[in-house]
């Protein structure tokens, strides 16, 4: 496609030397006593576009809600392209206009799925999993999304370069909940956690198994 003959890929990287120096300076390397039981650093996408659409017909809204719920049950596979049939997209296009010109290399369905549905699914998934875990353990939420629930403590945002690695080091377990637009690759957050010496608890991503040993280097 587009005249490209070869594509080479490497997973994202992390500057372990810089982070180790930071952890050493802050005296968090090798600490047996952790400050947080389970931590999550990230957005809850509570202002996602899909939930702002309040004018869809009931049958269309019901169908989209249903396929979002179905997708939420599956990790490492994207079923939305198959379920967003042409008749559904044609009707949807009458209500939701996307500013697309000929320079766009994606379809209307793909753009709507990535911008609207997948952030909505990620929002539902993150809130539901945090609520579930909050019933059995203490959760430390570091986010711009101010959200409270049983067992969940809100700590605001953290600086990516200097504060976030310390959170991962000071947590017994660190959650990664991959945004649904990343179907198979390793999210940067996984590398952030592992690079800071934290225990990674993540949803399944095919590429994680290609580079790391499950239940030894990360848990799912």
Where are these regions (language model features)?
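Hydrophobic beta-strand segments of well-ordered beta-sheets in folded domains
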Residues: 36-40, 137-140, 173-174
């Amino acid at each position: 496609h587009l005249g490209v003959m070869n594509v080479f890929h490497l997973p994202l990287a992390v500057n372990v030397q810089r982070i180790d120096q930071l952890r050493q300076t802050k005296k968090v390397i090798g600490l047996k006593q952790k400050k947080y039981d389970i931590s999550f650093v990230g957005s809850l996408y509570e202002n996602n576009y899909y939930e702002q659409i309040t004018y869809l017909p009931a049958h269309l809204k019901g169908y989209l809600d249903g396929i979002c719920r179905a997708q939420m049950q599956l990790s490492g596979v994207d079923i939305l392209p198959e379920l967003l049939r042409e008749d559904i997209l044609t009707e949807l296009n009458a209500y939701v206009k996307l500013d697309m010109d000929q320079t766009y290399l994606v379809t209307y369905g793909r753009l709507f799925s990535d911008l609207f549905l997948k952030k909505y699914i990620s929002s539902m998934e993150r809130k539901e999993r945090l609520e579930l875990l909050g019933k059995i353990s203490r959760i430390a939420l570091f986010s711009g999304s101010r959200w409270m629930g049983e067992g969940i403590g809100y700590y605001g945002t953290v600086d990516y370069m200097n504060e976030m690695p310390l959170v991962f080091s000071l947590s017994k377990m660190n959650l990664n909940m991959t945004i649904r637009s990343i179907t198979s690759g390793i999210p940067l957050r996984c590398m952030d956690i592992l690079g800071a010496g934290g225990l990674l608890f993540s949803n399944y991503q095919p590429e994680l198994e290609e580079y790391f040993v499950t239940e030894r280097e990360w848990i799912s």
